[in-house]
Swiss-Prot record:
GO terms for cellular component: chloroplast; chloroplast envelope; chloroplast inner membrane. Keywords: Acetylation, Chloroplast, Membrane, Photorespiration, Plastid, Transit peptide, Transmembrane, Transmembrane helix, Transport. GO terms for molecular function: glycerate transmembrane transporter activity; glycolate transmembrane transporter activity. Its main location: plastid. It is a multi-pass membrane protein. One of its GO terms (biological process) is glycerate transmembrane transport. Belongs to the CidB/LrgB family. The chain crosses the membrane at residues 93-113, 127-147, 160-180, 195-215, 238-258, 270-290, 293-313, 336-356, 367-387, 398-418, 425-445, 480-500. Coiled coil: none annotated. InterPro entries: CidB/LrgB (IPR007300). Glycolate/glycerate transporter required for photorespiration. Expressed in leaves, stems and flowers, but not in roots. The lineage of its organism: Eukaryota, Viridiplantae, Streptophyta, Embryophyta, Tracheophyta. It comes from Arabidopsis thaliana. This is Plastidal glycolate/glycerate translocator 1, chloroplastic.
């Protein structure tokens, strides 16, 4: 199409033999000495007047109809290009609208469920209840009207892929404000927490992996191919430059007009959010060898902290106030971290779609999956409580790190069931556990001789939740379905377990 538009109507290409035959077909019946003759042999046209040296021949079109025909072709090509551009724009608008509507419904459902549970004084994760409701609806539709279940899955697929694409970002705020969270924790307690986190991750990995192997040997279920899981699209250069522009403009604006949006937290929100997103985009594009020691989440958190440090220095306010504006925990005056963590509920709701997609896999390997997840979750909670007591860690800190192997969204819900906990420490410990798993899980699994994809997937997700899952599945896609299921079920079962008052009391008794 572009070539058509770029080629002139009268061009040297018209002098080709094929083109000459086409142009003169109406008038040539014979030739003699360069003359074109009619059927009766009379001279019609002398071509010698139009002859040019080789390489410079230029044969004028002999018919105005042919000229009009080629002009029409060019106009049609231009019309086609315009139509193509319009259709592309229309598709993009429809896709964006689809994403906004589907994601908006999930966020709205999460918000109203939270409000309802708070109003009813229900101490149970509202997002988990919503996840069960969505999964139940999908299962009912699948048994009665399968087309309706597929239609529902297709409708929410853009929102699901959006959540998967940006999932690590929702974990970052706890790392960004870590300097404020650990300020009151003694250094000796910090060392003990690090020991529990690192050793606990390794122990949970072993328990989940070897449990899965033992159950697989008993049930002897053959592994079959799972449903393919869609992968989010990579980041584009346009996204990088767009967020860079937002950062520069909002940073300068906040520097000269610190309360232009009403409060300092709102004014700081655009540049702190864009710096976080930029760090993640840049970190995701790093070579795999660098990602092993410099995970995208670390790059993301470091980018936000450096932006806060630069703004604190330039404005003279210092680092702490800017970090305080990053995560305010005030609904009426949110910061960038509050916006990101506001998606955590939608992460839990999205578990319903991933579980439904892999329902056949869950049914086939139910024994391995559920046994490993239950044993690993119970071990993780009670071993953390016991080791915390043995090393002399403060009870409030021990309780805060109990759900170290459970995804942030549900870990925060779990610690909210206990009194006197540090939720910022909880989130930070969960993220650090995931980072340890992301960096070392493949090497450790190989050392432990856990070769089975099911065991590797379950062990990774049960010990290092989403971050470990992403790291392993990037190189071992066959383990991804088992990672996704174990990742969701570990959080679900841990939340259900800690929602039982007797279990909470037993954990507190172990903690001392």
């Amino acid at each position: 199409m572009a070539t058509l538009l770029a080629t002139p109507i009268f061009s040297p290409l018209a002098s080709s033999p094929a083109r000459n035959r086409l142009s003169c077909s109406k008038i040539r019946f014979g030739s003699k000495n360069g003359k074109i003759l009619n059927s009766d042999g009379a001279q019609k046209l002398n071509l010698s007047k139009f002859r040019k040296p080789d390489g410079q021949r230029f044969l004028q079109m002999g018919s105005s109809k042919e000229m009009n025909f080629e002009r029409k072709l060019s106009v049609q090509a231009m019309d086609g290009a315009g139509t193509g551009n319009t259709s592309t724009i229309s598709r993009n608008v429809i896709a964006i609208s689809h994403l906004l509507v589907s994601l908006g419904i999930i966020l709205a459902a999460d918000y109203f469920l939270k409000q309802a549970f708070v109003a009813a004084s229900i101490k149970f994760p509202s997002a988990l209840f919503g996840m069960f409701c969505i999964f139940s609806v999908l299962m009912i539709f699948d048994s009665v009207v399968p087309a309706a279940a597929n239609g529902l899955m297709n409708f929410f697929e853009p929102a699901f892929l959006f959540i998967q694409r940006w999932l690590p970002l929702f974990y970052v705020p706890s790392l960004v404000v870590l300097p404020l969270s650990v300020r009151d924790i003694p250094a000796a307690s910090g060392v003990k927490i690090c020991y529990i986190v690192a050793g606990g991750w390794l122990a949970s990995l072993c328990v989940a992996g070897y449990t899965a192997i033992a159950v697989r040997k008993m049930v002897k279920t053959e592994m079959t191919e799972a449903e393919p899981m869609a992968k989010p699209s990579p980041f584009s250069t346009l996204e990088l430059w767009s967020w860079s522009g937002i950062f520069v403009v909002s940073f300068v604006g906040a520097l000269f007009y610190p309360n232009s949006l009403g409060t300092s937290a709102r004014t700081s929100l655009p540049f702190l959010l864009s710096s976080t997103v930029l760090g993640y985009i840049v970190g995701s594009g790093l070579p795999s060898s660098i990602k092993k020691v410099f995970h995208p989440i670390i790059c993301c958190a470091l980018s936000a902290v450096l932006a806060a440090l630069a703004f604190g220095y330039a404005s003279g306010s210092g680092l702490d106030p800017v970090l305080g504006n990053y995560l305010t925990k005030v609904a009426s005056d949110p910061g960038a971290g509050d916006i990101l963590m506001g998606f955590l509920g939608s992460v839990i709701l999205s578990f319903a779609f991933s579980m439904f997609k892999q329902r056949k896999l869950v049914k086939r390997h139910a024994a391995e999956i559920f046994t490993s997840v239950i044993v690993s979750t119970v071990f993780s909670l009670y071993s953390t409580a016991l080791v915390g007591r043995l090393v002399g860690l403060e009870p409030s800190l021990t309780v805060s790190i109990l759900p170290r192997c459970i995804t942030v969204a549900l870990a925060l819900s779990i610690v909210s069931l206990f009194e006197g906990t540090n939720s910022s420490l909880t989130a930070a410990v969960v993220v650090v556990t995931g980072l340890i798993g992301a960096n070392f899980v493949q090497v450790v699994l190989d050392k432990l001789r856990l070769r089975d994809p099911i065991a590797r997937g379950i062990a990774t997700a049960s010990s290092a939740h989403g971050l470990g899952t992403a790291a392993l599945s990037a190189k071992e896609p066959e383990a991804l379905p088992f990672c996704a299921i174990a990742y969701a079920l570990t959080g679900i079962f841990g939340s259900l377990l800690c929602s039982v008052p007797a279990v909470r009391q037993s954990l507190l008794a172990v903690v001392g």
